[in-house]
Amino acid sequence: QNGIEFVMYPRDYIIENVGPAINSEWDDFAPVVTADERFMAFTTRRQDGNTNENVFDDNLYYEDVFYSEKVGDKWSVARRIGEPINIPYHDSNLAISADGKQLYLYKSENGGDIFLSERNPNGTWTNPVPLNQNINSTYSENSVSISPDGNTLYFSSNRPITPGKTDLDIYVSKKDSKGQWGPAKNMGPVINTEYDEDGPFIDYDGKTLYFSSKGHKGMGGYDIFKS
């Protein structure tokens, strides 16, 4: 019923393919872009340039993080971001800070945790380190977004808020006076439903939160919402 309603009242949006400098014949996904739109990191399962020449159990190449920089108004040919971010196994980017100096990554350790790598002045990246236990739990944390001022973190987790309830919800954490991430708070029923909410992205206006949901009124499955 919802799908019929949305089809009857379409919105005008233009979707453009960013082209062969970024996209390959393999899966390319999860792009994150700096506020000035000059730097992009994304995850790919392409063969060319992959850290691991072997394939995973699904017969696809391992996830690797690649990046591209804008030259004029065009994206440069994407390149592997390199060690220590790229490893012989799955590595995937989740978010980038507005200034492009911090890259948040997902690793499958401990059920799925969020890691942080910082960009050095020479363009290399530091060893990814896990965020503190207020963010990472024994459950899965698999998406994250950082506010433009770097002081608020939005992330998804399937940690149970009631016994037996392990759907994905979106949480928020703020930095304390020591620069550490404080206790995570569930964003409540305005954002979260009894189904999965995932993929939060706080816009660079610092006010608009985009996320995907299976529970809010949509076409079915995951749809994109904003609040």
Residue ranges and their predicted role:
Residues 1-227:
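Short, conserved micro-motifs composed of acidic
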